Amino acid sequence: MGAGAEFDAIRGLLVTWGAQAAGIGDDAAVLAIPAGERLVVSTDASVENVHFRREWMTAEEIGGRAAAAALSDLAAMGATPCGLLLALGIPKGWLSELEPLARGVGTVAASAGCPIVGGNVSAAGELSLTITVLGSAGQPIPRSGARQGDIMFVTGRFGGPGAALRALLAGRQPVAAHRARFVAPVPRLREARWLAEHGARAAIDISDGLVADASHLARASGVSLSLDERAVPCVPGVSVEDAFASGEEYELLVAVPPASDIRADEFEREFGLPLTAIGVVIAPGASAVTLRGSLAVGLRGYDHLS
């Protein structure tokens, strides 16, 4: 590795990650996946003033949050992580923050059992982290597998990240528990594999909001969903409407055949997390989401380009 600020930055990243990035050094990474499994790949961007503001979070939190968001896409597919690549755009004055930023990425990747296998560093006007994650799954869970009669389940409780974001945008200090859910989401990797083993046949992670992502799943599956907003588990102090619209939850919405052996009490004992039935797949063709019979309009969630 040569001399200069760029290579000094890369060396600093490698020192921070240690053995977790031991394979970095060639022009490309070479990964092995278990025989009979399929490669699952996703890329996720975290951009300053779009996904976060620097005054809201520490550098370590920014790195960890970006890694968790990317790994959540593997969770949605029921995949086991096998590699992470980080492309960093660094603004002037941020070199001193690289070590905690890298530590945040590394801590979350390590908790997922995911090695860091490569990346890139470049100058940028604003901080950005583009993370590519790779995983493997014997039978990936698509968005497109929901069928009429399936039961729709969600993991976790909703509304914390949205409540934290509203407080931050208003210049207020968020409730500590809400802030923790906003800055330190947990990708539901183990939970997704358990759900897949127990019959889940369609899944999506909740990044844009529950209604928005339910609509994505319905459209991919060519079905309509009937959800009961009264059943949606909300964090204390958050309305159902706000919980439905709250993005960046990184919980899972899954479709499960009625004959499945999934038991919510068994799931909660295993993971310390609620699993709640919130609706059913009602019909093929229309690709709509209804709340007790009424179309779910006005609860669209986040749209990057609107």
Task: Describe the role of every protein-language-model region.
Residues M1-G12, E37, M57, P91-V117, ...:
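Glycine-/charge-enriched secondary-structure boundary and capping motifs
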Residues M1-T58, M77, C82, L86, ...:
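Extreme N-terminal cap/leader segments of soluble proteins
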Residues V40-T43, P142-R193:
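Short, acidic (Asp/Glu-rich) active-site segment that either coordinates a divalent metal cofactor
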Residues I62-L74, G104-V105:
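Short, well-ordered amphipathic alpha-helical segments that serve as non-catalytic structural scaffolds
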Residues A137-I141:
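Short alpha-helix capping/helix-loop boundary micro-motifs
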